């Protein structure tokens, strides 16, 4: 392994404020890199492709906390619901309801972040701030017993400054 996973992980962790947890984005990285990070204490990993996540989840240690970090189609929720710990990009009430439905089938509660669209790029997903306020005000989400809204996720536009 040419890449120094342990060394780089220690550099990042050294600069994090107390109480901040690192989600190591592991998509496209081989299991040996994830295992090296795991051996150094990293326990939260983020993936954005359901099939790659499923393969890694099957072979890596079972105490890893898996976060789904990309856009998630409703028809893919059923594949990750048995083991996912958090879905970081919920962009609609429809998706929230599907997560609840699939989590209930496995007698689980799945943590989620509501994704807000604040970027200039049209390619980004998310609720508008007004749509998010409306979703929360309408209160239908309160009846969803198998999801827990933990906060918001936003992706800013990539700029020079």
Model-derived features: where do they sit?
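Conserved alpha/beta-domain cores
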Residues: 1-161
């Amino acid at each position: 392994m040419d890449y120094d996973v342990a060394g780089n992980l220690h550099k990042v962790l050294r600069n994090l404020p107390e109480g901040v947890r690192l989600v190591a984005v592991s998509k496209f990285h081989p299991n040996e890199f994830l295992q090296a990070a795991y051996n150094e204490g990293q326990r939260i990993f983020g993936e954005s492709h359901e099939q790659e996540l499923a393969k890694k989840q099957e072979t890596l240690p079972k105490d890893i906390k898996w976060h789904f970090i990309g856009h998630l189609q409703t028809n893919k929720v059923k594949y990750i619901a048995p083991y996912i710990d958090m879905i970081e990009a919920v962009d609609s009430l429809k998706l929230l309801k599907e997560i609840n439905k699939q989590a209930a089938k496995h007698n689980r509660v799945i943590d989620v972040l509501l994704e807000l669209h604040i970027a200039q790029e049209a390619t980004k997903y998310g609720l508008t701030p007004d749509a998010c306020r409306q979703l929360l005000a309408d209160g239908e989400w309160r009846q969803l017993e198998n999801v827990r809204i933990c906060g918001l996720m936003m992706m800013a536009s990539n700029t020079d400054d």
